[in-house]
Amino acid sequence: MIKRYAIVWSRLIVIAGILFTTSLSAAEIQVMISAGFYKAYSELVPLFEQETGHKLITTRGPSQGDSPEAIPTRLKNGEPADVLLMIGASIDDLTSQGLVRAGSKVDLARSEIGMVVRAGTAIPDISSVEAFRKVLLDAKSIAHSDSASGIYLSTTLFEQLGIAAQLKDKSRKIKGPPSGEPVAAVVARGEAEIGFQQVSELIHEAGVSYVGPIPAELQQETYYSAPLATAATQADAAETLIRFIASPRGASAMADAGLAPLSSK
């Protein structure tokens, strides 16, 4: 009987030791993420947390701009971050400012700018540059994001098409999450006739019809990447997260979200 109790106790001690070790190794990973990658990320969060025991603390904000919610602003203000999931071009700027660890960036996915109209309305032809230009001129109102895609449209593309002056008064910049909303929501309510954002931020939204990507000749491809923040306190756990996102399961989630995965290690 004594021997039996000894065996039981020894097993309990082993189990307790495993649980204690797991609790010690589990980390709270601070993640900053832009909206274009959020759909894929949100699908992976419960899987990652269940398999690793780590907890993801997520902060959302645009990759570019100087709003209080923008990731560059958050980092400059000293908000905690271990890993960033955002546009690669912005990461290069943050690296030069010493806010991102040089050499830590892993490229994850490619995205394009797309267009939506309100559900139930006619789908316009944007298959050529001229057709797209006509749609812009004919539209009564246009909505675009306050992040990378919208900045490109309002500062480069409209000028390139020679119609910036005609579009100025009918174009509207939409503040995105966390305190704002997707461009598609504005279009769905009928507050804008057409809307533009990253494809991954459009195709799963209710109340709109996805028209397609803007013409290839005008397209600005966006690359989403994941680096470590210079101030990361959970670098090892953050690297585990990056590898998980770059895995085949991560690639599947990215594809489902409308992104083109770059790796599936």
Over which residues does each language-model region extend?
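N-terminal cationic amphipathic segment used for targeting or macromolecule association
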Residues: 4, 14, 24-25, 79
